[in-house]
UniProtKB/Swiss-Prot annotation:
Origin species: Physcomitrium patens
Cofactor note: Binds 1 Mg(2+) ion per subunit. Binds 1 Zn(2+) ion per subunit.
Family designation: Belongs to the RNA polymerase beta' chain family. RpoC1 subfamily.
Protein name: DNA-directed RNA polymerase subunit beta'
Disulfide cysteine pairs (residue numbers): none
Biological function: DNA-dependent RNA polymerase catalyzes the transcription of DNA into RNA using the four ribonucleoside triphosphates as substrates.
EC number per UniProt: 2.7.7.6
UniProt enzyme class: transferase
GO molecular function: DNA binding; DNA-directed RNA polymerase activity; magnesium ion binding; zinc ion binding
Length: 679
């Protein structure tokens, strides 16, 4: 079992054969060592009990029922013994079958298909050989002829040669006899995973690193040849050298040996992670992993028999069986990676180990990263433009369920409910006092919103919850960038931070208005897009006619009366909004707005000529420009300025000013101490 106090992180790396053996092997009180799975059996067809030394063996993985051994004895009866001497099963809890592992001792080394076939191929990069050549070697289509010792021997072949070549059979017919071929193969040639393992074990990683760096440096200093094909060839060689340098450096830094990419011991998962379930009338359903494990054990045992009877087994048959073992292990680890997957009797591909752990429904994302936790909920998100940037709308039904413990404490603390049962009854009846207490609690308690997949830290942010009607979570449209969310049916999870540390972290680090910039690039994240940009464009669109809008229509008719159509004057934002609500002006109608005594915009006022100039008897002048008016006294000083604008632009400018003032107030509020909420 993994305890949180003992383990703080998880590291995934290559395991040595000794480490794999240490995971599975255990010494029983009688001195017997168990852990190796040698039989391809699962459950007995009559008793439905695990077979000894099989894939569900109770001696290896632990008892099916806590305190009961395979022969039916109880721990209470055998209270002075920790295991049953008759069947060898320990008296422990059955949950050990969730983490106790076994192993299969392979009769020949098997190349791990992840490091061979996955791109980039680590084995091909480390050995600096083509992937097709290595594949032919792994699956016994080619043989590696290379002397192990440096002593002179009769036959020394260099490189690779094809097994199907008939000239080989004609030249060396005696070596293809049973014993001659075996002796020749053990000394001079290798194929399958054994050939890969020998090459990897003979690698000097520091030498590979040094020579690759020297060659890469020479290629970098080399000038272009002018031939496009040669330049591409040199670039591919440089890319290969860079990959070799990185790979060799990582192996040296982590103290991992390259030959560990070839398996000699195959781990067997705990039986609870690959269960076999009994249905009605004795019918059994099993995990696909069990069938794949059985195929590996069957073929491995056959190879063991061939090697044990080497005197009567043809060498070609042994080579074919080595290939079958390699393909069986490939199907267990990653079925279908080489093309045609292994299928069952219903022509359905088996679900391999890679299929179990990868993807959205894999072990990591489904069971480890996607656990269900208390004080959390999930619902569809919809747009909430009326919210502030740091707010989110929680449905009443969800909020009362999430904050139920806090509401109960508030009811009992205020003596509104005598006990827990009465408080729950009030919540179920949805009495009005419940919502008042809930609002008070939510004012001082942030919530965390998370949208899967959480690819960076902006995938989970804190918000101030607001009670709303309906069943969907309301979200401000500007925070969708960090979540990569849109309102086409996306769902988000709500979490309640319980501890004071979690609440402090949510307030200081995770609030949405404190995460406006991308932590990776520094670019703004909360930027308007899509319908927001379209709405802002329509709101602030300019009336192209401007002050000339009444030139073609100087009069207007209302209630059979004709009035002079003049551009209206307003002294404040409120007057404009009031006139717009009373439908006296339109959204894009041009109007004059009083702008104080100073022109707060950068303009070419000294070069622009007025359209019209008016003087009165007291010496006050009116200069009318295309976008503004200046009212000056005798000394030519401005004491009144009007600007030409529209209702939409005034609404937009008013919202911007209120947002800036709200930010200033919020910053002043953060510097003050927060009042305590008594419940």
């Amino acid at each position: 079992m993994i305890h949180r106090e003992k383990y703080h992180h998880l590291r995934i790396r290559l395991a040595s054969p000794e480490q794999i053996r240490s995971w599975a092997e255990r010494v029983l009180p009688n001195g017997e060592i168990v852990g190796q799975v040698t039989k391809p059996y699962t459950l007995h067809y009559k008793t439905h009990k695990p077979e000894k030394d099989g894939l569900f063996c109770e001696r290896i993985f632990g008892p099916i029922k806590s305190g009961i051994c395979a022969c039916g004895k109880y721990q209470i009866i055998e209270k002075y013994s920790k295991f049953c001497e008759q069947c060898g099963v320990e008296f422990v809890e059955s949950r050990v079958r969730r983490y106790r592992m076994g192993y299969i001792k392979l009769a020949c080394p098997v190349t791990h298909v992840w490091y061979l076939k996955r791109l980039p191929s680590y084995i091909a990069n480390l050995l600096a050989k083509p992937l097709k050549e290595l594949e032919s070697l792994v699956y016994c289509d080619l043989f590696l002829a290379r002397p192990i010792s440096k002593k002179p021997i009769l036959l020394k072949l260099r490189g690779l040669f094809k097994y199907e070549d008939q000239s080989w059979r004609e030249i060396f017919p005696r070596y293809f006899s049973s014993r001659g071929f075996e002796a020749f193969q053990n000394k001079e040639i290798a194929t399958g995973g054994d050939a890969i393992k020998k090459q990897l074990s003979n690698l000097d990683l520091q030498g590979v690193l040094d020579y690759a760096y020297i060659e890469w440096k020479e290629l970098v200093e080399q000038k272009s040849t002018g031939n496009e094909w040669e330049d591409r060839k040199i670039q591919r060689r440089k890319d290969l050298l860079v990959r070799r340098i990185k790979l060799a450096k990582q192996f040296l830094q982590t103290n991992i040996k390259p030959e560990w990419m070839v398996l000699s011991l195959l781990p067997v998962l705990p039986p609870e992670l690959r269960p076999m379930i009994e249905l009605g009338e004795g019918e059994l359903i099993t995990s696909d992993l069990n069938e794949l494990y059985r195929r590996v054990i069957y073929r491995n045992n056959t190879l063991i028999d061939f090697l044990a009877r080497s005197g009567s087994t043809p060498g070609g048959l042994v080579v074919c069986q080595i290939r079958l073992v390699q393909e069986a292990v490939d199907g267990l680890i990653d079925n279908g990676i080489r093309g045609q997957p292994m299928k069952d009797s219903h022509n359905r591909p088996y679900k391999s180990f890679s299929d179990v752990i990868e993807g959205k429904e894999g072990r990591f994302r489904e069971n480890l990263l996607g656990k269900r936790v208390d004080y959390s909920g999930r619902s569809v998100i919809v747009v909430g433009p009326f919210l502030s940037l740091h707010q989110c709308g929680l449905p009443r039904e969800m909020a009362i369920e999430l904050f139920q413990a806090f509401v109960i404490r508030g009811l009992i603390g205020r003596h509104l409910a005598p006990n827990l049962r009465a408080a729950k009854s009030m919540i179920q009846n949805k009495e009005p006092i419940i919502w008042k207490i809930l609002q008070e609690i939510m004012q001082g308690h942030p919530v965390l919103l998370n949208r899967a997949p959480t690819l960076h830290r902006l995938g989970i942010q804190a918000f101030q919850p607001i009670l709303i009607k309906g069943r969907a979570i309301r979200l401000h449209p500007l925070v969708c960038g960090g979540f990569n969310a849109d309102f086409d049916g996306d769902q988000m999870a709500v979490h309640i931070p319980l501890s004071l540390e979690a609440q402090a972290e949510a307030r200081l680090l995770m609030f949405s208005h404190t995460n406006l910039l991308s932590p990776a690039t520094g670019d703004p994240v909360s930027v308007p897009s899509q319908d927001m940009l379209l709405g802002l464009y329509i709101l602030t669109i300019k009336n192209h006619q401007g002050i000339y809008g009444n030139k073609n229509h100087p009069y207007k008719q209302n209630n059979n009366k004709i009035f002079l159509n003049k551009t209206p004057y307003f002294s404040s934002y409120d007057d404009v909004i009031k006139a717009y609500n009373q439908k006296k002006v339109r959204l894009h109608s041009a109007l004059w707005l009083w702008w104080g005594s100073k022109l707060r915009t950068i303009t070419s006022i000294n070069r622009e000529k007025p359209i019209e100039v008016q003087y009165n008897s007291s010496g006050i002048s009116f200069k009318i420009y295309e976008h503004y008016q200046l009212k000056k006294n005798k000394n030519e000083k401005n004491f009144s300025v009007y600007i030409c604008t529209t209702v939409g632009r005034i609404i937009f400018n008013q919202q911007i000013e209120e947002a800036i003032q709200g930010t200033l107030k919020a910053s002043l509020f953060r510097n003050q101490s927060l009042p305590a909420i008594t419940i």
